[in-house]
Amino acid sequence: MRPEDLDEVLGIERASFSMPWSRGAFLYEIQQNRVARCWVMRDEERVVGYLCLWEVSDEVHITNIAVRPESRRRGLGRTLLGGVLDDARQRQIRLVVLEVRPSNTQARTLYESFGFRVVGRRRGYYYDTGEDALVMENDLQTARPGTRA
């Protein structure tokens, strides 16, 4: 992700989340946060999705993933997440963690299809609604048969 991608990224972010990240938050991640990495996915002309993460030691924490609303249900989120997990495996990352709203069943289904499992709950995590966050993790060292984990 580059600063010149941010207008499109912010459009996707605002269309995807009730608590969108700001331009400043994305700029911090791509310019100053030494543990952050962010990618964009493009079609021929535009950004169609993105993913941001933090990498610390042998763990990855996925902080943000979204796909342009009109491009959803085409496997783009699956491609983004799969690419990150493949990269993590190659670099011998042990654990991938993320938070998700319990009400976000589409995202949960995607994560579960890659071998993520619920390991905890953060009470009142989403301040806009007070909804909890489910903490999901994927232990890349103990992948289960039939998953990409």
What is the role of each PLM region?
Residues 3-70, 81-91, 120, 139-149:
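Acetyl-CoA-dependent GNAT
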Residues 29-30, 104-105, 127-128:
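Short secondary-structure capping/turn micro-motifs that flank functional sites
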Residues 64, 68-82, 89-91, 95, ...:
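Conserved glycine-rich acetyl-CoA-binding loop
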Residues 78, 131-140:
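Accessory recognition modules or surfaces
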Residues 99, 112, 117-134:
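Conserved catalytic-core motifs of GNAT/GCN5-like acyltransferases
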